[in-house]
Amino acid sequence: MDDIISRTVAELERTGRFSEMKRFRQHGRYSVYDHCVNVAREALRIADRVGGKLDREALVRGALLHDYFLYDWHEPEPNRPNHAFHHARMAWENARRDYDLSPTEEDIIRHHMFPVVPIPPKTPEGWIVSAADKACALKETLSRNAPNKDTEQQEDTP
């Protein structure tokens, strides 16, 4: 794991419920935790290619928290709204409750589902994480039966 990602993961695990994301499946055998680490890694790769003045700390932190909704979206619940349209808001609410977020981190979390949700990101970091999220979701979904080799997590994801 990149140093900035490792450092940020350690801080989020120490100060909030970040580790709980390991319990929830995201795409195939990938946990939400694995997915968020993959998105942070891909966002850094995109940022390196794009260049320019970017807040790399906010980029990584927002990427790691973009799916901080903390529930199993594969299990239907009658009172829970449609996951695709509402999980970004739930992730943002949980992240605000557990962490102090910068405006850039809030933008990343709230708008990563563009264009499914029609409000686009306002920051370059938000656009990068939105793109990284879609790239990782596609890769994870298409390799859904493959064990996760992209993160250091050793436990088998349900």
Language model regions located:
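Metal-dependent phosphohydrolase cores
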Residues: 1-158
